[in-house]
Each structure stands twice: as structure tokens, then as C-alpha cells.
């Protein structure tokens, strides 16, 4: 049933905040675990094996927690991708049941690390009822992720896992370490050596499809144990011909001829000898005879000769050598003298009295 306190936008915002907070915590805890490995190597070098084992348990706890955070980050991302189903449907979609129940179950266990996770769980409980939230917190509904529950459990890590952590740390830092022979002898057969479980299903572990083998046999999914691969078909042997028998083409495969006549075989060709090369080389014509024949054949051709292409008009050639210049007068050496009747000044030619008289006459007429 639809809860009254559900707010879709608040759920969306807090889902994004949870993803960002989880990414930061994963990075921080991974860096701290790398530094702690150096301290464990120092303990092993100093001979403090028991102290190193206790520190390894802390590292395993942190690695478990980082893996659990990665699972929660994946579920938050899934809810954001399918947020339309949460808004539109009143009932819980079957594809979101594991994500919703796992987030509600993990909220009280990680709310000290991620405070926004509690808000997400409260909004989901308001959406799908408080009774559903109680069932998820106790896992009575049975949809909480088992792998996440194992990573966040309070049980101590296996002793064989602690020893293998110590072996790998000593190998990386070149520190001599002798593992506990009692613990190594009690290790069950087939225990995984790595901490992070990649989550293989039973079908893959029992012989599912290979991972990029490149040419090997791929067993079908869900095949029973002990299934033997089907052998590859072998090519049929070809009959070897006898060295003395003549070559013959094989009979054509397919329906028989419509005429009903038997199909014959091609027989080998009889022994045909190549022609003999003559003892004396053949005579050839000389070069002079060939040239004479060409001249005769060209003389026998009768007909109008093809006209030559018209040449473009050529530009007239200027003959600068035959050009005659006219005879010019010589340059005078002295300045010309003024004539006797010419006036030397322009002011002497103007009669001002005559001009004033004529001006007065004009004034009187007007």
C-alpha cells in the first residue's frame, strides 16, 4: 500500500548521495588497508606473528566491508535506473525486491558510516509499508542478498584465510614467513584462495561456458557433471592411386544421366613425341631487303597527299637596323637677344589715363 510519508524526489536525492558517499568510503578504506599491509610485514620481519594475525583480521574485516559497500552501491544505482517503476507502481516490482530488501536490511548496520542510507530505508518503508520493513530487517521475507549478509556478519574469518593473507603479504614485501602447518593441513580441499568472491553461479563452477578459451569445447549451460565433450569428426582417408595405373578423372556425383547411357571414363592420352628440332637454323630476311620492300610499298600508294595543317600567321619582324632618324637642328650656344621694337615691360604698354577716361564716359551714359 502507498505510504503517506513517501516523497519520490527525496528518495532520488538520497540515493545519489549514498552512491557518492560509498565511493569515497571505498577509496579511503582501500588506501588504509594498503598502509596496514606494510605494518603487518614489519611485524612478520620482527617475529611478531600473533600480532600480525590480529592485524590481518582487521584487514579482512575492512575488505569485507568494502565489498559490501560495492554491493549496496550497485543496488542504489539499480533503483535510480528503475525509478519510474517505484513512482508508477503501488506494489513492489519483483525485479526490485532484492535491492529494496537488502538496502532496508543494511541501513541499521551501516548508518554510522552512511547517514543517508537510513533516510533511503525510511522512504522505502513508507512506500511499501512498515510491516514490509520489519520483515526485511529480520530477513523473514528471504530476499536479502546472502553474500552481503556474509560480508557484514560478526563471525571471525577462517584461519586458513588469515594464513593465506600472511603468505601473500610476506611474498609481496620479501619477508621470510613460515605458515602454521597445523592450519594449512586442516584446510579443506577446494577452498578459494582469494578473498573477493566474484559470485559465480553453480552452473559456471560445474563446467559452464569458458571465458574466452578460443577454440576449446564449450559445455552447454546446465549440463550434468562428468559430461564428456563430443569428439570432432575425422576426415575420411583418400585411396592412394597405384603408381602404374593411368590417370582417370573421378566419376561425377549426383543423379544419373537422363538418357540412361553409362558414363564413360576418360582414358589416358597415348604417348605423343614432341616434334624434332631441325639441325640447320632457318634463314631470315636481311634488314636491307625489309627496307626495300617498305620503299616499294610506299611508292605504290596512289592518291592525294594530305594537306599540311595551316601555320599560324607569324608576327612581322621589326628591322631596327634600317630605321633612319631625321636630321635635327643643332642646339644654340648663346641666349637670344631682345628685338629693338619690343617692349621690355608689360606695364609700359598699359595706358591708365585712357582707361580712366573711358570709364567716366560709361558712367555718364548710364
Swiss-Prot record:
One GO cellular component term noted in the UniProt record for this chain: cytosol
Phosphoserine: modified positions: 4
InterPro entries assigned to the protein according to its UniProt record, in alphabetical order: Ist1, IST1-like
Phosphotyrosine: residues bearing it: 43
GO process annotations (BP): cell division; collateral sprouting; cytoskeleton-dependent cytokinesis; establishment of protein localization; midbody abscission; positive regulation of collateral sprouting; positive regulation of proteolysis; protein localization
Keywords of this entry: Cell cycle, Cell division, Cytoplasm, Cytoplasmic vesicle, Cytoskeleton, Nucleus, Phosphoprotein
Subcellular location: Cytoplasmic vesicle; Cytoplasm, Cytoskeleton, Microtubule organizing center, Centrosome; Midbody; Nucleus envelope
Pro residues bias locations: 306-315
Ranges annotated as biased composition (Low complexity): 337-347
PANTHER family: IST1 FAMILY MEMBER, IST1 HOMOLOG
Assembly mode: Interacts with CHMP1A, CHMP1B, VPS4A and VTA1. Interacts with SPAST, STAMBP, and USP8. May interact with VPS37B. May associate with the ESCRT-I complex. Interacts with MITD1, in competition with VSP4. Interacts with SPART (via MIT domain); leading to the recruitment of SPART to midbodies. Interacts with SPAST.
Function: ESCRT-III-like protein involved in cytokinesis, nuclear envelope reassembly and endosomal tubulation. Is required for efficient abscission during cytokinesis. Involved in recruiting VPS4A and/or VPS4B to the midbody of dividing cells. During late anaphase, involved in nuclear envelope reassembly and mitotic spindle disassembly together with the ESCRT-III complex: IST1 acts by mediating the recruitment of SPAST to the nuclear membrane, leading to microtubule severing. Recruited to the reforming nuclear envelope (NE) during anaphase by LEMD2.
Family affiliation: Belongs to the IST1 family.
Name the UniProt record assigns to this protein: IST1 homolog
Amino acid at each position: 500500500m502507498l505510504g503517506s510519508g513517501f516523497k519520490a524526489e527525496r528518495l532520488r536525492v538520497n540515493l545519489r548521495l549514498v552512491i557518492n558517499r560509498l565511493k569515497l568510503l571505498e577509496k579511503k578504506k582501500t588506501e588504509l588497508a594498503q598502509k596496514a599491509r606494510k605494518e603487518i610485514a614489519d611485524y612478520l620481519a620482527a617475529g611478531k606473528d600473533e600480532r600480525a594475525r590480529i592485524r590481518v583480521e582487521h584487514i579482512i574485516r575492512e575488505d569485507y566491508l568494502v565489498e559490501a559497500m560495492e554491493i549496496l552501491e550497485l543496488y542504489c544505482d539499480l533503483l535510480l535506473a528503475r525509478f519510474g517503476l517505484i513512482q508508477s507502481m503501488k506494489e513492489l516490482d519483483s525485479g526490485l525486491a532484492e535491492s529494496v530488501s537488502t538496502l532496508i536490511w543494511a541501513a541499521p548496520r551501516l548508518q554510522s558510516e552512511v547517514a543517508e542510507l537510513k533516510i533511503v530505508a525510511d522512504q522505502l518503508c513508507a512506500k511499501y509499508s512498515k510491516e514490509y520493513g520489519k520483515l526485511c530487517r529480520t530477513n523473514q521475507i528471504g530476499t536479502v542478498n546472502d553474500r552481503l549478509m556474509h560480508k557484514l556478519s560478526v563471525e571471525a574469518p577462517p584461519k586458513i584465510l588469515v594464513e593465506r593473507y600472511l603468505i601473500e603479504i610476506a611474498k609481496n614485501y620479501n619477508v621470510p614467513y613460515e605458515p602454521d602447518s597445523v592450519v594449512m593441513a586442516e584446510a579443506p580441499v577446494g577452498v578459494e584462495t582469494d578473498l573477493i568472491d566474484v559470485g559465480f553461479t553453480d552452473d559456471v563452477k560445474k563446467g559452464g561456458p569458458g571465458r574466452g578459451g578460443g577454440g576449446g569445447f564449450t559445455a552447454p549451460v546446465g549440463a550434468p557433471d562428468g559430461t564428456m565433450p563430443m569428439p570432432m569428426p575425422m576426415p575420411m582417408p583418400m585411396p592412394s592411386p597405384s603408381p602404374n595405373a593411368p590417370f582417370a578423372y573421378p566419376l561425377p556425383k549426383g543423379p544419373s544421366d537422363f538418357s540412361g547411357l553409362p558414363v564413360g571414363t576418360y582414358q589416358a592420352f597415348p604417348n605423343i613425341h614432341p616434334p624434332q628440332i631441325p639441325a640447320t637454323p632457318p634463314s631470315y630476311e636481311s634488314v636491307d631487303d625489309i627496307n626495300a620492300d617498305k620503299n616499294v610499298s610506299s611508292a605504290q600508294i596512289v592518291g592525294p597527299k594530305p594537306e599540311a595543317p595551316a601555320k599560324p600567321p607569324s608576327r612581322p619582324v621589326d628591322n631596327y637596323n634600317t630605321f633612319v632618324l631625321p636630321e635635327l637642328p643643332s642646339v644654340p650656344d648663346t641666349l637670344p637677344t631682345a628685338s629693338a621694337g619690343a617692349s621690355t615691360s608689360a606695364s609700359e604698354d598699359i595706358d591708365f589715363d585712357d582707361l580712366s577716361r573711358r570709364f567716366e564716359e560709361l558712367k555718364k551714359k548710364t
